[in-house]
């Protein structure tokens, strides 16, 4: 059964919650930095528990190599860390979680190959794919197989078009709408330029929704400039048009790699508007050889920040395990595993069930659970696979995120 490709309710919720998101109840996490090293006793307990309750096999798909490797590895790490935590606490009613990540290099065809490899491994539930185009491609296969799919970060509307698919992140239209509302309601600027990647569903989808809501907010789009994956190193033309048009704010619904180049080139042109991004901007402070002072004052909407008290334990555990600070993709995947755990408990799933039977059990269970995660408190899902949670606005101040 196909779902309706709509997200109006989510967009309305996000808009209503933006003003109050800074005061929301902290999300709960059970991560602890001291758990980074598993003791022999704990490993023995896990083995014994797995023998008694069995193992739930969760596949993970994302770009582990190539330009998008930062995202795919974060998703794989977030899933692994959550599974380790759950297993050390006794699993899911004694059932252990085993994760296995496969590389899709951010390529739809290779993502299908990764999916088939995980099926051969015995995958029963899928956490992924990480990015939208591969997620859409794999989604068709997962629907045919009746495989339960929860994508941590596939934000295109089509990623959850079928009734077996759910997501943790916000959908693209919701991010665009919420960004325009935030800019308008907080009177950040009136003259707006947009620089977006027309070759990706992510950037194009956010941009389209932003433009529609900007009109409602009385924002004037003075420049609307595109680039593609084949022309993402020189942004002189786009920046010149934005500067000449008197843009007070430049909206960047793009990933942080290109954003870091734009910030450097804008600085060289002595063009200093407010720069505003979405969740794909998360990670800009970790770009190799990037002068992070150029990101000072940059704003973005994201449901996760490592500087929040509620994220501290997870961040410490992640750094101890992987030697790098987590980004939103890691947090999304971590929450995806805990959503699977809650739904499995709700549905009474056991390890000896087939992937199809597990999918049939989890679909209704997902609409009955609520979790306090890293990316939202009291998160719930509707039958269209969309999460209900509040975004958060952050600003980079002195090289760190500061909640707004």
Task: Please name every model-derived segment.
Residues 22-25:
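Bacterial signal peptide processing site
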Residues 27-32, 36-404:
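Extracytosolic ligand-binding ectodomains
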Residues 17-20:
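C-terminal motif of bacterial Sec signal peptides marking the signal peptidase cleavage site
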Residues 1-10:
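Positively charged n-region of N-terminal signal peptides that target proteins for export
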């Amino acid at each position: 059964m196909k779902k309706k490709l709509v997200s109006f309710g989510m967009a309305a919720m996000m808009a209503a919650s933006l003003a109050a998101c800074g005061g929301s109840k902290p999300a709960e996490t059970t991560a602890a930095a001291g758990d980074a090293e598993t003791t022999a006793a704990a490993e023995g307990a896990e083995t014994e528990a797995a023998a008694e309750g069995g193992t739930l096999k969760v596949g993970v798909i994302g770009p582990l190599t190539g330009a998008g490797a930062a995202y795919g590895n974060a998703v794989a790490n977030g899933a692994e860390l959550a599974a380790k935590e759950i297993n050390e606490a006794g699993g899911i009613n004694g059932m252990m979680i085993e994760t296995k990540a496969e590389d899709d290099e951010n390529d739809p065809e290779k993502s299908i190959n990764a999916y088939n490899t995980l099926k051969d491994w015995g995958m029963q539930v899928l956490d992924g794919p990480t990015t939208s185009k591969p997620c859409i491609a794999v989604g068709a296969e997962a629907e045919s197989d009746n495989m339960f799919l929860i994508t941590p970060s596939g934000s295109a509307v089509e990623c959850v078009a079928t009734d077996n698919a759910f997501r943790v992140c916000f959908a693209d239209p919701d991010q665009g709408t919420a960004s325009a509302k935030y800019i308008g309601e907080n009177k950040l600027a009136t003259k707006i330029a947009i620089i977006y990647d027309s070759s990706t569903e992510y950037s194009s989808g956010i941009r389209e929704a932003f433009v529609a809501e900007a009109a409602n907010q009385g924002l004037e789009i003075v420049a609307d400039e595109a680039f593609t994956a084949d022309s993402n190193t020189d942004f002189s033309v786009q920046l010149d048009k934005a500067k000449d048009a008197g843009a007070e704010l430049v909206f960047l619904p793009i990933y942080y790699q290109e954003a870091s180049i734009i910030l450097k080139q804008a600085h060289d042109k002595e063009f200093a508007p407010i720069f505003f991004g979405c969740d794909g901007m998360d990670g800009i402070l970790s770009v190799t050889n990037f002068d992070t002072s150029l990101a000072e004052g940059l704003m973005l909407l994201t449901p996760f920040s490592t500087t929040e008290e509620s994220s501290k334990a997870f961040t410490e555990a992640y750094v101890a395990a992987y030697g790098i600070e987590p980004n939103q993709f890691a947090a999304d995947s971590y929450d995806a595993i805990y959503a699977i755990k809650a739904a499995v408990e709700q549905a009474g799933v056991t390890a000896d069930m087939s992937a199809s039977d597990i999918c049939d059990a989890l679909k209704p269970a997902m609409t009955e659970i609520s979790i306090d995660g890293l990316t939202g408190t009291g998160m719930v899902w509707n039958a269209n696979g969309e999460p209900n949670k509040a975004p958060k606005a952050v600003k980079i101040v002195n090289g760190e995120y500061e909640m707004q």
